[in-house]
Swiss-Prot record:
Catalytic activity annotation: a UDP-3-O-[(3R)-3-hydroxyacyl]-N-acetyl-alpha-D-glucosamine + H2O = a UDP-3-O-[(3R)-3-hydroxyacyl]-alpha-D-glucosamine + acetate
Protein function: Catalyzes the hydrolysis of UDP-3-O-myristoyl-N-acetylglucosamine to form UDP-3-O-myristoylglucosamine and acetate, the committed step in lipid A biosynthesis.
Residues that bind Zn(2+): H79, H238, D242
Keywords: Hydrolase, Lipid A biosynthesis, Lipid biosynthesis, Lipid metabolism, Metal-binding, Zinc
Descriptive protein name: UDP-3-O-acyl-N-acetylglucosamine deacetylase
Gene this protein is translated from: lpxC
Pathway info: Glycolipid biosynthesis; lipid IV(A) biosynthesis; lipid IV(A) from (3R)-3-hydroxytetradecanoyl-[acyl-carrier-protein] and UDP-N-acetyl-alpha-D-glucosamine: step 2/6
Cysteine disulfide partners in this protein: none
Main EC class the enzyme belongs to: hydrolase
Cofactor: Zn(2+)
Keyword hit for Iron-sulfur: no
Length: 305
């Protein structure tokens, strides 16, 4: 059978919180089968757990934020969540001694390296996938996102940014998902923002960790980072990275085709909730052997080494 995955050992890293600008210690722990993805704030006494759950996503202005019934929150989970989706990690406990996951370099790559350093272990329990059975679409003005049935996981994302630094030919990205494709094509794409917005937020005591070290920063005309872009179409690739993290909030890899136009955290979450709320639109599936498994989810040697 295709088995659930967790980590082989505990790993730790430090980084800066995007919102507070303070040092954050991140600890990733293995977890037993059927635990799911658990985010934990250890700066609170007692520590507070936030299971990855589409319904817990409430605040999506600057990032994906999980909020519990007591209005306690943990922020900036989407890039780490994307790395978990990319490597197919089903069970993990993620601890931070702060109200947010560290921003690292603004991409998912540091989290991928950390997870690979921990090693991936298979558990003796069948891995559950969410398979899309019917088309589900959500809209917000001219923005939209949808899932269609597809035997794999494909993503097709279009942005519409009228900016001199973003050529019109670099505003759409499509790919057939796999762990290899995610690591090579998506994981290194960084978040981005306008210098004026960052300066305004920082003047109000927000986004205090925002810098050239953790984002692509643009003014009205150009990219301001000395090293430029990692990909010509890094902006749309990062929006796809965000979507992969947002959609993994159901705690399972999804078998289906995701298509989006100008979508963001809020609309991605709205789509996921719309799918899960429509019982006939999806089902849980497991696979007895590798031959049945869609190519998207076959583990590359780097993951299960």
């Amino acid at each position: 059978m295709i088995k659930q995955r967790t980590l082989k050992r505990i790993v730790q890293a430090t980084g800066v919180g995007l919102h507070t600008g303070k040092k954050v210690t991140l600890t990733l722990r293995p977890a037993p089968a059927n635990t799911g993805v658990i985010y934990r704030r250890t700066d609170l006494n007692p520590p507070v757990d936030f299971p990855a759950d589409a319904k817990s996503v409430r605040d999506t202005m600057l990032c994906t934020c999980l909020v519990n019934e007591h209005d306690v929150r943990i922020s900036t989970v989407e890039h780490l969540n994307a790395a978990l989706a990319g490597l197919g990690i089903d069970n993990i406990v993620i601890e931070v001694n702060a109200p947010e996951i560290p921003i690292m370099d603004g991409s998912a790559a540091p989290f991928v390296y950390l997870l690979l350093d921990a090693g991936i272990d298979e558990l003796n329990c069948a891995k559950k996938f969410v398979r899309i059975k019917e088309t589900v679409r959500v809209e917000d003005g001219d923005k939209w996102a949808e899932f269609k049935p597809y035997n794999g996981f494909s993503l097709d994302f279009t942005i519409d940014f009228n900016h001199p630094a973003i050529d019109s030919s670099n505003q759409r990205y499509a790919m057939n998902f796999s762990a290899d494709a995610f690591m090579r094509q998506i994981s290194r794409a960084r978040t981005f923002g306008f210098m004026r917005d960052i300066e305004y937020l920082q003047s109000r005591g927000l986004c205090l960790g925002g810098s050239f070290d953790c984002a692509i920063v643009v003014d009205d005309y150009r990219v301001l980072n000395e090293d430029g872009l990692r990909f010509e179409d890094e902006f749309v690739r990062h929006k796809m990275l965000d979507a992969i993290g947002d959609l993994f909030m159901c705690g399972h890899n999804i078998i289906g085709a995701f298509i989006a136009y100008k979508s963001g955290h809020a609309l991605n979450n709205k789509l996921l909730q719309a799918v899960l709320a429509k019982q006939e639109a999806w089902e849980y599936v497991t696979f007895q052997d590798d031959a049945e498994l869609p190519l998207a989810f076959k583990a590359p040697s780097a993951v299960l080494a």
